[in-house]
């Protein structure tokens, strides 16, 4: 500490630039900042740029002809169109269902809200393709509903219609949580004021409530769109001939070893994703009238008229029961010998999972277990560096992490394979590269949660620590990090769930040594071992639920005594 | 030993437009004598908080140097300055108990364990916090939280103690009590202190010197008594409580007194001290409302414009031949309350009347 004061002797200070002083005042923290920023650039920005480069550069250098050639191929345009169509359709439907659920849960006297809430969140904590599996089981050629119940012999479950159904249900929780948060944070006095001015329920809804939640509705639609574009598992399993960019890029890469086309398709995915993301960040977010603090305001007027509540409740229960049906089907099938053909109950599939498949299960848990704390602590640290310390070069960190979040997993996965396949960064086939992908892909949620929380922590609490003689680094670990605990837990839960259930990026990275449960499930489905796949899915959902419950318990037991 | 000197300190905030293009503090010179408490007083945006934060080390001056006890600290980081600070929001660490809060800074000193314990318990005793030592700060009252904040700030035996509007979160009664408590402890410990507030009565009650600031510049640096009764500028006069600044003319001059005419009457005659006046010269007189009273034989005549009943007194806003004049009548129960539109005869207690220096800018240097 005294060293620092000697290093920059007194006197006229105008000469030494302000940003240099920031570094000198806390060299440790700047060191951390430099390492974090460099890591983000290498593991987030570099792979994406590698893919972009591969899309336009061949052996002959910058190759417009090769680019033009790929662009004339019909599968490029078809898959781009398919992706956009699917994304837009799913976004609209998922947002609508999310709104219905959120409105019913916050503004009506619908019975069984806790049940509806719990089930509506299920899809968020399970692998994205559990739904696809369930749909195949229920509506496939030998489907429980199509064949057993309805006797249809040649049902075609594969294609656009199934994808829309699955994605809409799978992404409803995103819209539901988003819109619910905003509905809850609207000051109920606004709706009361409208009523007191003589407005009917409908007028209040359409002129006050709806305009106030419009930003949340738009933002939900954009987020679902991004998720749909990124989704790999569902289109892969159930798309049939309806190929999206993610699937097409994968099959070009892995099926035809066509790196150039694969890179171009993955690059194309960036366009809708980044556009939607930027619109969300710089347009929708700025139009928000309400700050979502997560703190519900006073009780709002509940709509109790049967004419409104009954149809809404029926709709909600239909959605929730559909979700529940899908999950129960998967569990049922995991205990069925040969679904649709031999429906005797058995635990054979679980036996398979715990013997032959045990390795992949422990792999997944181990790698996700490593990635989770790294993601969460790094997220808090980055939030702190960005919100509290504006080091020179902060923008690199900010944009690096945003890019990794907005970029679909496919481009990240392809980028990793292409970037880290030669020294000095020869990482392909290692566990490290899988963990890196998990961390990078899930970092942003922790950063957002951490930043929001930091902005609510009085800055003078940290300043007090400094006046008492603590360095920036010590202040972060002893004062800031403990105060960020809620955000830390949000980030831990999210990172764990996502790391365990991710597919789109890691499918390019797994190796014989390090295979993951999600990849295994996919290959089980492809080889029609539906029962084993269902057993894996059930275990995965159970593990995630158990770990989340454990974390919740830990959080509440370590909360400050009142 | 820990005298604080600001020499020629300026602070520019880049990208801030408006008043003097982001110049928050403009060539400020200030000395805080060892063991004294100096208050920076002024409206928001006057640069007082920036000045305090520069002494703490949160802001770095754009120009100039700051020394504490002869050591140049201009480029020393906050955590190496050995300053204690009491924050407006108290900034108590919410995840620690009262004792842990107080211990935090002492732990960083690497003292022997028993000495650390001794220091903490003696400070807790001084602040009457022993019974609350193991509570969370959120379970304490505002006044108790304030004491914890002070305990935490002084336990490391800082060279300088900084107060950033520490009482503004308390209700009026508690504020006065804590104010006296803060001052008593500061005097007892003899710590050189800088105190920032926008409350003039707080400033007068607590300080050895009051520094009134405006637009990043010191308007006056003086004892509380002088700042109140001999303001250097109209701004200071009006900022330090209510003041009538009446336009007058020098009517009569002799060796020791000067008589001032306000509008049509010679309103008062007061000792001239050693100041120079010219007959007929225009002057501005600071007359505090408490020094004007209703008097049937008074020289001045004023028309009542507004009457505000305050309990202990009645506040009148009157029109004194075209000039606004406010005064307080605490005798109303004897004389009755006048009504709007009524004419009153007033007299001025001439002893405390203060004639503002002619040229504020020229006089400012003298005052400082």
Predicted regions and their residues:
Chain A
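Transmembrane alpha-helical segments of polytopic membrane transport and secretion proteins
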Residues: 1-35, 280-318, 552-562
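Membrane-water interface segments at the C-terminal ends of transmembrane alpha-helices
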Residues: 25-60, 72-184, 208, 212-233, ...
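Internal catalytic domains of large membrane-associated glycosyltransferases
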Residues: 173, 192-193, 203
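Juxtamembrane inter-helical linkers in multi-pass membrane proteins
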Residues: 192, 200, 287-303, 339-353
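Glycine-rich helix-loop "coupling/hinge" segments at transmembrane-helix boundaries
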Residues: 232-256, 341-342, 503-530
């Amino acid at each position: 500490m005294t060293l620092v004061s000697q290093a920059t002797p007194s006197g006229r200070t105008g000469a030494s630039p302000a940003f240099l002083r920031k570094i000198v005042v806390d060299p440790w923290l700047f060191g951390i900042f430099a390492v974090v920023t460099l890591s983000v650039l290498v593991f987030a920005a570099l792979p994406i740029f590698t893919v972009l480069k591969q899309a336009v550069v061949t052996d002959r250098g910058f190759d417009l002809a090769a680019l033009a050639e790929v662009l004339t191929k019909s599968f490029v345009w078809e898959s781009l169109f398919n992706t956009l169509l699917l994304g837009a359709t799913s976004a609209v439907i998922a947002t609508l269902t999310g709104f219905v659920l959120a409105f019913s849960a916050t503004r009506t006297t619908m019975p069984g809200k806790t049940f509806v809430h719990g089930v509506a969140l299920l899809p968020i904590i399970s692998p994205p393709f559990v739904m696809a599996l369930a749909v195949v089981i229920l509506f496939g050629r030998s489907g429980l509903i199509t064949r057993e119940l309805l006797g249809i012999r040649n049902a075609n479950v594969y294609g656009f219609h199934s994808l829309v159904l699955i994605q809409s249900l799978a992404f409803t929780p995103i819209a539901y949580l988003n819109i619910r948060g905003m509905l809850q944070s609207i000051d109920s006095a606004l709706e009361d004021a409208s009523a007191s001015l003589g407005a009917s329920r409908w007028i209040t809804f359409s002129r006050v409530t709806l305009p106030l939640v419009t930003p949340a509705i738009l933002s939900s639609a954009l987020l679902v769109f991004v998720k749909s574009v990124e989704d790999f598992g569902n289109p892969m399993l159930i798309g049939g001939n309806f190929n999206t960019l993610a699937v097409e890029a994968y099959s070009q890469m892995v099926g035809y070893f066509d790196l150039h086309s694969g890179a171009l398709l993955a690059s194309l995915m960036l366009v809708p994703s980044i556009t939607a993301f930027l619109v969300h960040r710089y347009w929708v977010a700025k139009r928000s009238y309400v700050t979502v603090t997560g703190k519900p305001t006073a009780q709002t007027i509940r709509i109790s008229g049967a004419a409104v509540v009954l149809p809404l409740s029926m709709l909600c229960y239909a959605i929730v029961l559909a979700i529940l049906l899908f999950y129960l089907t998967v569990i049922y099938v995991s205990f069925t010998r040969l679904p649709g053909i031999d429906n005797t109950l058995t635990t054979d599939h679980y036996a398979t999972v715990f013997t032959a498949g045990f390795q992949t299960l422990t792999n997944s848990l181990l790698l996700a277990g490593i990635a989770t704390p790294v993601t969460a602590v790094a997220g808090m640290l980055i939030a702190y560096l960005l919100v509290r310390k504006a080091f020179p070069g902060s923008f690199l960190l900010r944009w690096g992490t945003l890019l990794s979040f907005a970029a679909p997993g496919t481009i990240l996965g392809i980028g990793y394979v292409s970037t880290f396949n030669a020294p000095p960064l020869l990482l392909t086939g290692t566990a490290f590269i899988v963990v890196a992908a998990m961390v990078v892909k899930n970092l942003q949620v922790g950063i957002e949660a951490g930043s929001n929380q930091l902005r609510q922590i009085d800055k003078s609490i940290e300043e007090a620590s400094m006046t008492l003689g603590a360095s920036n680094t010590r202040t972060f670990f002893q004062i800031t990090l403990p105060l960020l605990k809620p955000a830390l837990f949000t980030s831990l839960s999210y990172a764990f769930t996502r790391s365990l259930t991710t597919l789109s990026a890691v499918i390019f990275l797994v190796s014989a040594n390090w295979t993951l449960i999600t990849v295994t499930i996919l290959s089980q489905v492809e080889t029609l071992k539906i029962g084993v796949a269902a057993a894996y899915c059930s275990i995965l959902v159970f593990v995630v639920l158990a770990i989340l419950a454990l974390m919740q318990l830990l959080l509440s037991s370590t909360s400050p005594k009142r | 030993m820990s005298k604080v000197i600001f020499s020629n300190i300026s602070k520019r905030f880049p990208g801030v437009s408006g008043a003097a293009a982001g110049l928050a503090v403009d060539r400020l010179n200030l000395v805080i004598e060892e063991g004294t408490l100096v208050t920076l007083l002024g409206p928001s945006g006057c640069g007082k908080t920036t000045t305090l934060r520069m002494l703490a080390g949160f802001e770095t001056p754009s120009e100039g140097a700051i020394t504490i006890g002869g050591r140049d600290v201009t480029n020393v980081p906050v955590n190496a300055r050995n300053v204690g600070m009491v924050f407006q929001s108290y900034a108590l660490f919410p995840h620690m108990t009262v004792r842990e809060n107080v211990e935090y800074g002492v732990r960083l000193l690497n003292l022997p364990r028993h000495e650390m314990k001794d220091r903490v318990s003696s400070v807790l005793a001084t602040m009457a916090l022993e019974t609350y030592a193991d509570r969370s700060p959120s379970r304490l009252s505002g006044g108790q939280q304030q004491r914890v904040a002070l305990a935490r700030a002084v336990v490391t035996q800082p060279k300088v103690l900084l107060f950033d509007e520490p009482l503004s979160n308390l209700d009026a009664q508690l504020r006065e009590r804590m104010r006296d408590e803060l001052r008593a402890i500061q005097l007892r410990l003899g710590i050189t202190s800088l105190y920032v507030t926008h409350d003039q009565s707080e400033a007068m009650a607590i300080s050895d010197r009051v520094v009134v600031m405006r637009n990043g510049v010191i308007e006056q640096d003086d004892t509380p008594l002088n700042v109140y009764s001999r303001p250097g500028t109209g701004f200071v006069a009006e900022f330090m409580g209510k003041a009538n600044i009446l336009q007058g003319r020098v009517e009569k001059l002799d060796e020791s007194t000067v008589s001032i005419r306000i509008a049509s009457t010679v309103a008062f005659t007061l000792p001239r001290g050693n100041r120079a006046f010219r007959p007929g010269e225009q002057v501005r007189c600071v007359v505090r409302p408490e020094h004007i009273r209703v008097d049937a034989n008074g020289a001045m005549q004023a028309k009542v414009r507004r009457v505000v009943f305050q309990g202990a007194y009645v506040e009148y806003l009157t029109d004194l031949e075209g000039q606004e004049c406010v005064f307080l009548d605490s005798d109303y129960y004897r004389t009755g309350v006048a009504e709007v539109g009524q004419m009153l005869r007033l007299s001025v207690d001439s002893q405390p009347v203060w004639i503002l220096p002619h040229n504020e800018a020229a006089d400012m240097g003298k005052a400082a």
